[in-house]
């Protein structure tokens, strides 16, 4: 018994040596998991007994490519099938042909070798069994089966079909183990050499057995047809029965061998994966304090459990090296989230954008609410990842739970709250959440560090630009009045007064941005700018300003901050207590006025009539807030000089003065 075991081990060592000599990967990459899913779908459908069951999958085969290779997937399948369909007589020829296949597949990784061979098996047996499978309910399929001399009655070859089904399931299961092993990021962590060496040896041998078993299945195609040809054959029923049992037995034997291998290999792969994840988890804890040469180590670690092409931009699959030497913004969010669209506008559609955007990249990392992605969430992700201009994680549902837990526990990611983690070109974490910063300033915030945010707040105070920059064009000198209310009577009065003031010659733009939406047509008829999108972005922007300022107030609680107070008052505005609010300014300035006081002052401006011409709206509102002088005052101005003056104001109260012509 020990002698036999030694001989078997010696043979396995020889096989491994031969396999390694024929293994020369050139960097080409195939989505083995997706292709295996299609293979499993095809074979499980044609091998099932219930014809009425629908095919519960969408066709993804057209999206599968062989990357970094001139060889297309269909051509690779064809090239392999030519060798697999050649007849082999005896075990020795099958072994030799198996090694020929490995020479043919030398440029591919181990998981791709196994999956491509199974792809040939699915294409061949799928084409043979599909007409047989559908013949009961489809006359055309029955005719095709007869023309190809295929047996329509499944009972005649059911034992063989069951054995084939057993073997195919076993091959698929062990191939999943190979794929899982190939996805383990050994570059990011170290594994015990003995454990790794033993597992690698089993991966090689298992791949060999999958290829050899698939080749054996292909060699039994003539038997599959012989039940239909039995009437023309001289073989007796007994002889056919013996051949049937022999063929089924051969497939069953291979299937049980692979099932036993699967149990051992699956445990080994799980152990390797667990050890690597534990070490990666330890590295993640130190990721903020480690020194890096660039951002590649950090990004490879964060997306370590993905394949060589873990990212995508639109439908193009890309590697992490494409964001080297750039500032990287990791956008963590549910798919989708409202700030995504504002972020898109601020970083890509903002009028002030220049070539700065070439120096940074956004990588969207969608995180679902539950541990398992729903079909709806996958569809939403596919739509937005193929529509939005930034990079996204490809197949985020395959991300490691270790990484996701790290985001939630160490980075404090919360559901329904998108966050934007900034990694500079040297791999340093310069801002653990730049979301509010980007929503406020867009590309002006580059390089999106905490220190840059402090600089921006020193440069910007309370102004119309701060409120509207990036969501509505503001020009220095043009006066804007933003107003809001839930009182329809007050809004109508405000709009009526504003139109009268505009008729006096005041250049004034009105923007309605209350929390309550009004009829859009009615607002347009009143010459009022109203946009539900602008309304949504305005309040989203205010919330971002509040959060950004709040972080600084926590650091310096005793220092007064006008911006924070003004924004907080707007967000907490009591529409039941007050009729409305207004903010007036000309770009670099802004003044907030209570709604009741606003209309009261506007009525004064209307009463002034032409005497207010020459004043700006903001200036007129400020003057109207002052009480007029109790005593009458007179200012004598030469006639020619008065012709050039648009308005004359009282030196004491600043109210506009009526004009009279006096003759001396």
UniProtKB/Swiss-Prot annotation:
- BP-aspect Gene Ontology terms: phloem development
Tell me the domain of life: Eukaryota
Pfam families the record matches: SEO_C (PF14577), SEO_N (PF14576)
Protein name as catalogued: Protein SIEVE ELEMENT OCCLUSION C
* Species assigned in the record: Arabidopsis thaliana
């Amino acid at each position: 018994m020990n002698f036999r075991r030694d001989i078997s081990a010696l043979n396995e060592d020889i096989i491994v040596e031969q396999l390694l000599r024929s293994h020369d990967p050139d960097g080409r990459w195939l989505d083995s998991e997706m292709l295996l899913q299609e293979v499993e779908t095809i074979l499980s459908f044609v091998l099932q007994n219930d014809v009425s069951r629908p095919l519960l999958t969408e066709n993804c085969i057209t999206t599968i490519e062989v990357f970094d290779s001139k060889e297309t997937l269909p051509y690779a399948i064809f090239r392999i099938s030519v060798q697999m369909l050649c007849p082999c007589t005896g075990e020795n020829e099958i072994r030799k042909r198996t090694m020929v296949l490995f020479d043919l597949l030398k440029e591919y990784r181990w998981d791709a070798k196994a999956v491509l061979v199974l792809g040939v098996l699915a294409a061949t047996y799928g084409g043979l069994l599909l007409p047989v499978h559908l013949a009961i309910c489809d006359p055309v399929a029955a005719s095709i089966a007869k023309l190809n001399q295929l047996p329509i009655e499944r009972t005649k070859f059911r034992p063989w079909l069951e054995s084939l089904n057993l073997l195919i399931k076993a091959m698929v299961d062990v191939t999943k183990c190979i794929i899982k092993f190939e996805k383990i990021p050994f570059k990011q962590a170290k594994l015990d050499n003995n454990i790794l060496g033993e597992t690698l040896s089993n991966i090689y041998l298992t791949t060999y057995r999958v290829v050899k078993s698939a080749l054996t299945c292909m060699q039994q195609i003539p038997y599959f047809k012989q039940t239909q040809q039995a009437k023309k054959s001289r073989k007796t029923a007994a002889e056919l029965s013996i051949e049937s049992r022999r063929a089924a037995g051969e497939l069953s034997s291979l299937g049980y061998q692979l099932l036993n291998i699967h149990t051992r290999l699956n445990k080994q792969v799980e152990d390797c994966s667990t050890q690597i994840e534990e070490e990666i988890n330890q590295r993640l804890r130190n990721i903020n304090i480690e020194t890096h040469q660039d951002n590649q180590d950090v990004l490879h670690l964060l997306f370590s459990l993905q394949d060589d092409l873990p990212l995508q931009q639109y439908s193009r699959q890309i590697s992490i090296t494409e964001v080297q030497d750039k500032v990287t913004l990791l956008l963590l969010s549910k798919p989708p989230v409202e700030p995504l669209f504002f972020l898109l506008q601020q970083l890509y559609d903002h009028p002030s954008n220049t070539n700065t955007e070439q120096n940074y990249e956004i990588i969207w990392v969608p995180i679902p609410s539950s541990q398992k992605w729903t079909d709806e969430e996958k569809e939403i992700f596919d739509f937005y990842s193929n529509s939005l201009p930034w990079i996204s994680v490809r197949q985020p549902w395959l991300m490691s739970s270790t990484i996701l837990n790290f985001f939630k526990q160490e980075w404090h990611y919360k559901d329904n709250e998108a966050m934007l983690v900034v990694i500079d070109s040297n791999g340093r974490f310069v801002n653990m959440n730049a979301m509010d910063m980007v929503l406020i300033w867009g590309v002006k915030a580059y390089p999106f560090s905490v220190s840059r945010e402090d600089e921006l707040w020193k440069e910007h105070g309370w102004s119309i630009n701060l409120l509207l920059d990036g969501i509505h064009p503001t020009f220095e000198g043009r006066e804007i009045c933003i107003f809001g209310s839930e009182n329809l009577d007050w809004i109508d009065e405000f709009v009526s007064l504003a139109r009268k003031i505009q008729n006096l010659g005041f250049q004034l733009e009105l923007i309605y941005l209350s929390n309550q939406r009004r009829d859009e047509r009615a607002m347009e008829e009143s010459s009022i700018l109203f946009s539900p999108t602008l309304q949504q972005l305005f309040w989203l922007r205010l919330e971002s300003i509040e959060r950004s300022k709040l972080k600084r107030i926590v650091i310096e609680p005793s220092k007064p901050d006008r911006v924070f107070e003004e924004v907080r008052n707007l967000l907490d505005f009591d529409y039941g207590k007050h009729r409305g609010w207004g903010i007036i300014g000309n770009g670099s300035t802004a003044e907030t006025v209570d709604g009741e006081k606003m209309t009261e002052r506007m009525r004064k401006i209307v009463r002034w009539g032409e005497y207010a011409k020459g004043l700006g709206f903001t200036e007129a509102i400020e003057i109207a807030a002052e009480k007029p002088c109790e005593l009458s005052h007179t200012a004598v101005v030469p006639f020619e000089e008065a012709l050039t003056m648009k308005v004359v104001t009282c030196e004491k109260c600043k109210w506009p003065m009526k004009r009279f012509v006096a003759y001396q």
